[in-house]
């Protein structure tokens, strides 16, 4: 990017407007499309004046509705494609809201970039992929093309290939990979940069699988999954009925709704199913956290009946 919003001051924040002239040379001498990140209305005006073909909104900017609205207003009446990175925090509604602001301003050529989400204490990835969030975005915004930024997700060049393949396996429409002729000398994000030769190798190893699964074999499996899901829903409804009955007993006996010891024992009991690797322990915890949260909500409703 010509401009680079950084987490802390003092880091390289881009060359600025001067770099637009470099992009103009690339476009005129090599015939390539050029793009840059924009974070303010001034950036938009300068980029458009320089003939930049595509703009993108960075993660930190997406997280600020005021900044997105300012950019949307600056783009009103302009036919230029705009890509929007997910916000740094895992909030699908905030991401969708950025698209709504742009669309309402008349920007119709829109695309999404998944670059991962900040997570306190994250060690392996620079930004946790949390694939379920871009999947939910696509479920709700199916017409929006989505590309993946494995460089920012991984934060390490050795993760770019595997993350790129995961994105393609999830039917992403493309990739945004950072490359540098000499990554050691890169002024920012040097650890995640790959050389052009390395990029060529990565691209040669990627496999694009067919998204067409409309055949009899898949229909059979999906019918089986539907039957299992129906049973799961029936059991969840029964479980919540029992939770409400427990709430009534707790109300009668003056007991607190949340019982930490009981919850911890439940988690311990079911994580034993994870030992053979057939299901991830974090997935089990996540499932039971969601079920327990709804059980607590149901019990609180019973305990507080008549107190609203």
Please place each PLM-identified region on the residue numbering:
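Glycine-rich, proline-tolerant flexible connector loops at the mouths of alpha/beta enzymes
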Residues: 1-18, 180-190, 246-257
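Active-site mouth loops of central-metabolism enzymes
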Residues: 8-14, 32-38, 58-59, 88-90, ...
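Alpha-helix-loop-beta-strand connector modules within alpha/beta enzyme cores
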Residues: 11-36, 71-81, 131-146, 192-211, ...
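Catalytic beta/alpha-barrel core
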Residues: 15, 31-40, 44, 53-67, ...
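Short, acidic/polar
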Residues: 39-46, 159-164
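Structural recognition of alpha->loop->beta junctions
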Residues: 47-61, 102-110, 166-173, 276-278
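Catalytic alpha/beta core domains of metabolic enzymes, predominantly
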Residues: 67-198, 207, 213-216
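Domain-level signature for soluble enzymes in the chorismate/prephenate branch of the shikimate pathway
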Residues: 211-308
């Amino acid at each position: 990017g010509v401009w680079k919003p950084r987490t802390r001051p003092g880091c390289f924040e881009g060359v600025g407007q001067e770099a637009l002239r470099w992009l103009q040379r690339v476009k005129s001498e090599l015939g390539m499309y050029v793009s840059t990140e924009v974070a303010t209305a001034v950036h938009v005006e300068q980029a458009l004046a320089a003939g930049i073909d595509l703009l993108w909104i960075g993660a930190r900017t997406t997280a600020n509705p005021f900044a997105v609205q300012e950019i949307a207003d600056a783009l009103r009446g302009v036919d230029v494609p705009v890509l929007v990175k997910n916000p740094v925090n895992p909030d699908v509604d905030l991401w969708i809201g950025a698209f709504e602001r742009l669309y309402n301003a008349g920007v119709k050529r829109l695309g999404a970039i998944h670059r991962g989400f900040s997570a306190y204490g994250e060690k392996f990835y620079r930004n946790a992929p949390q694939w379920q969030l871009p999947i939910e975005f696509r479920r709700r915004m199916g017409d929006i093309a989505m590309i993946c930024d494995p460089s920012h997700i991984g934060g390490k060049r050795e993760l770019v290939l595997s993350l790129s393949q995961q994105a393609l396996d999830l039917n992403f429409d493309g990739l945004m990979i950072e490359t540098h002729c000499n990554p050691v000398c890169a002024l920012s994000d040097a650890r995640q940069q790959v050389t052009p030769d390395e990029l060529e190798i990565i691209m040669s190893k990627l496999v694009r699988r067919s998204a067409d699964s409309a055949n009899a074999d898949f229909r059979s499996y999906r019918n089986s999954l539907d039957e299992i899901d129906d049973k799961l829903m029936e059991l969840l409804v029964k479980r919540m009925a029992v939770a409400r009955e427990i709430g009534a007993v707790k109300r009668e006996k003056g007991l607190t709704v949340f019982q930490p010891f009981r919850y911890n024992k439940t988690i311990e009991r079911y994580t034993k199913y994870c030992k053979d690797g057939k299901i991830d322990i974090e997935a089990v915890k996540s499932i039971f956290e969601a079920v327990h949260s709804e059980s607590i909500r149901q019990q609180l409703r019973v305990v507080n009946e008549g107190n609203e």
